[in-house]
Amino acid sequence: MTSLKLLKEKAPLVICITNDVVKNFTANGLVALGASPAMSEFPEDLEDLLKYAGGLLINIGTLTDENWKLYQAALKIAEKYNVPAVLDPVACGAGEYRKKVADDLINNYKLAAIRGNAGEIASLVGIDVASKGVDSAGVDNIDEIALAANEKFNIPIVVTGEVDAIAVNGEVVTIHNGSAMMPKVIGTGCLLGAVVASFIGLEKGQELKSLETAMLVYNIAGEMAEKRPNGHLPGTFKVEFINSLYEITDEDVKEFKRVK
């Protein structure tokens, strides 16, 4: 099974083209975990950096026409150097423009995984789910949404919510770890996309296990953070979450994982 130890040994360079609001939090989270983030946003620079990268995150949270072109350029370069790319289609169910951009990136470029909440992923496959911007109401059929997207796009899918679902090659697992504090801190979902990009390329042909490990590490770190003194307060939780990403071990994952 792909391990946190392997991530720390490889320390993959992860190029993050992400939401302006979350860049600092994302970079600190990846460093704490053991990856090496770069927040590059210029095609010529990406040409230089991606040849050394272990992963690329495309997060469409701060969406403009210029950024759309940047996403396209980055994905072309990533494919050139066989760098696994993860798409976070932020709020793609909230409006036609975001949906159009997400559809373009999925249909015309090579992706290693898509990570989104239930509302976002459901919108990509035409399933009706109550959603509001970047947030999504709790749903009971999250595994069905993940499988539907996996079957439609033939891409590994991670759907997050109160329960998380991972679908790869028609197989689905659900993760029942996590903290209710996570949605109360802006950027936790965006950082998760970067964490997925850190793990997805560690072992070729082991995408399901890599994604499962990424989700378990992330969610169990959230549980650890909430248990710290004042971890029930969002400001403290944010700091303790970074600390927990730094301290979590494979032994913690093995002990506390809840997978079905």
Swiss-Prot record:
It holds the Pfam family HK. Gene3D superfamilies: 3.40.1190.20. Keywords: ATP-binding, Kinase, Magnesium, Metal-binding, Nucleotide-binding, Thiamine biosynthesis, Transferase. GO terms for biological process: thiamine biosynthetic process; thiamine diphosphate biosynthetic process. Its EC number is 2.7.1.50. Signal peptide: none annotated. Its cofactor is Mg(2+). ATP binds at R115, T160. InterPro entries: Hyethyz_kinase, Ribokinase-like. Substrate binds at M39, G187. Pathway: Cofactor biosynthesis; thiamine diphosphate biosynthesis; 4-methyl-5-(2-phosphoethyl)-thiazole from 5-(2-hydroxyethyl)-4-methylthiazole: step 1/1. Catalyzes the phosphorylation of the hydroxyl group of 4-methyl-5-beta-hydroxyethylthiazole (THZ). Belongs to the Thz kinase family. This is Hydroxyethylthiazole kinase 1. It comes from Streptococcus pneumoniae (strain JJA).
